[in-house]
């Protein structure tokens, strides 16, 4: 009975205002056009940001080859250094001064003289690390600087970076989750056109896959977005770790000189300090590997009840694993051949990755549980009716 009253009420309302339907249609069309316009603007803006980040990344990679002052130098007081003007603090670890060995370039105030990459990105990020390190330092003459101030400053910087990029990384993870959820339907489409070599069948298969992705709001490019963002961030922090004067002056835990290159020390000064860097690599490299492996294990647990994967998706999964192994090998080489401060950054970054991946895992599991409860409640309501 209430349903009939509602229908009558709607009919009376429509009869009373004959222009109501047209107004609603116009309003919906206006909202649709506005949404479409915002979508186009957002896509253009996103493409512009990706192009900008790509240029920044390439600039950061090639600048060392083009300009002599961008080459990092392990010696304190050599190469390009970021710190305070000479005489500002009275602490040789923070005040910029040359050791008169080789070329020396100071970066104590904002300038674009060293290029936009340093001026726009490296300098602002260094002004987060440098004040924290100075405020939490062990004063000269009060004991050895064990490096806790550097660890604290890098944790703050990494936290801010993760806070900025969490939307991107979360979207990338959720996109992969959606891809896993539709693997069963994707396998059905591939099985449907298995052995079909004609052009029309290939087009139909591609259209059905695109329709499936669109239905579930899956963007195949989402997994690559993180790479575009990660590379410039790595280059920025790499430059900070290798050019910030107080980091070059630290002997971490009175054990590892962060200005030294692990592999060089192992082969040239093994009996004195080189052997300690073997321990350094044994600590840093496995943590980096675990930070890549554990998220895969968590993802497998989340999707262990999923339908069978298609042959193509299995090949894609194996390809992703191979790429991750290549990336890990590259990171291991960079850690071994760069100043030890870079290894400390990788270690802390790996811990952040593990924490963020675990929180994302919990978020996805909780969201799935909530969805299941919602679906079960709807089914119960339908059964009662």
UniProtKB/Swiss-Prot annotation:
Coiled coil: none annotated. This is Membrane protein insertase YidC. GO terms for molecular function: membrane insertase activity. Required for the insertion and/or proper folding and/or complex formation of integral membrane proteins into the membrane. Involved in integration of membrane proteins that insert both dependently and independently of the Sec translocase complex, as well as at least some lipoproteins. Aids folding of multispanning membrane proteins. It is a multi-pass membrane protein. It holds the Pfam family 60KD_IMP. GO terms for biological process: protein insertion into membrane; protein transport. Its main location: membrane. Belongs to the OXA1/ALB3/YidC family. Type 1 subfamily. The chain crosses the membrane at residues 38-58, 112-132, 150-170, 224-244, 247-267, 270-290, 325-345, 346-366. It comes from the Bacteria. Interacts with the Sec translocase complex via SecD. Specifically interacts with transmembrane segments of nascent integral membrane proteins during membrane integration. One of its GO terms (cellular component) is plasma membrane. It comes from Mycoplasma pneumoniae (strain ATCC 29342 / M129 / Subtype 1) (Mycoplasmoides pneumoniae). PANTHER family: CYTOCHROME C OXIDASE ASSEMBLY PROTEIN COX18, MITOCHONDRIAL, OXA1. It is found in: Cell membrane. The keyword Transport applies. Keywords: Cell membrane, Chaperone, Membrane, Protein transport, Transmembrane, Transmembrane helix, Transport.
